[in-house]
Each structure stands twice: as structure tokens, then as C-alpha cells.
């Protein structure tokens, strides 16, 4: 779990519930000892600045070439290809355009029923917390939608990258951590990618 700034402790609790070991990542050398990464929620402008301050941009991009990465809320913003805010320099993992804080400021944070499509032909509605949530405005051809709120995508998967507009760790929705990091799960991303490609 990237621990430069933001909401990382609950991600460790999620991994603990799933029986998956997790460790903090605060410097680029610590990327060498992990097999996947969560970029947590927080303040995307601050996180973008700290990534450059600690010279982690290139190591993170290189890590993402061959390892699964999940971003929640601010983490989704940092994973996007395009963010129309010059204060944020995204990593470009997901071929999406993201609008920061599109669902409101922190005082307007909300819990909404989000419709999820984890497997073809099935959908599940779950109460989901959005805090100053970013909105995905455009999608590239490689993007598969795993969740929608009022017809807009809030959970997207592309290869080994998973981006979420919300905070699954707050609502103990563990399936997203399983998708990227639990090879024994029926929802593991390699199986979902095969389904989406079919």
C-alpha cells in the first residue's frame, strides 16, 4: 500500500481479513519487495507532488508495467491518462479522463447504491461510500466497466489495473482487493479479463 499520504490503514485491514500480507511502501526501493500495489484515497494534488518529491514517478510507472495496481478515489485520479488539472501529473495506467471532486466536496460525501458487474450476465447493488469522488468522463477501448452509479462508470478494469471512484475499504467491500491480489478468488482479474474478452 502506497503510504505517501491519505487513507491507507483500512486497506491493510482489508488485506488482513483476506489473509493476504500487506506492507507499507514509502520509498521506491520498497517496490522491489511487493507483488502488487494499492494507491489509496487522499488528496491527489498532494500525492502527485510527493510522488515527484520522493522521485517515485518512474519507479511506479515501471512497476505498473508488470504488476497489478489498484487506485481508490485519489488513487484513481493518479492512475488516469488525463486529468484536466495542471496540479496533478497522472501515471497514465488507465486510458480514462477523470474530473477531480466531481461528486462534491467532502461535506457533500455520500453513500449510494452502486451497480456492479463482476461476472457476465450478473449484477449486484451495494451501498458504497463516495468522498469527494472523481468522475470518469471518458473511456478508452481497453477499459471494462465493473461498476456504475446513475449510468456513469465508477469502477473500471484494464488488464492488471483497477480504478475505483469510491472507498471499498470503508464499506468492507473486499471483492476489489480479491480481484487484483487474490489468485485463488473466482473474481481474480485474469479470469475477469478472459470473460470480458469473450
Question: Model regions: which residues?
Answer:
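N-terminal beta1-alpha1 cap of cysteine-dependent amidohydrolase-like domains
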Residues: 1-62, 174-178, 182-198
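Hydrophobic anchor at the start of a short beta-strand
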Residues: 22-23, 69, 161
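General beta-strand structural signal in soluble alpha/beta enzymes
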Residues: 24, 71-72, 156
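Flexible, charged surface loops at secondary-structure boundaries
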Residues: 30-34, 64, 139, 156-157
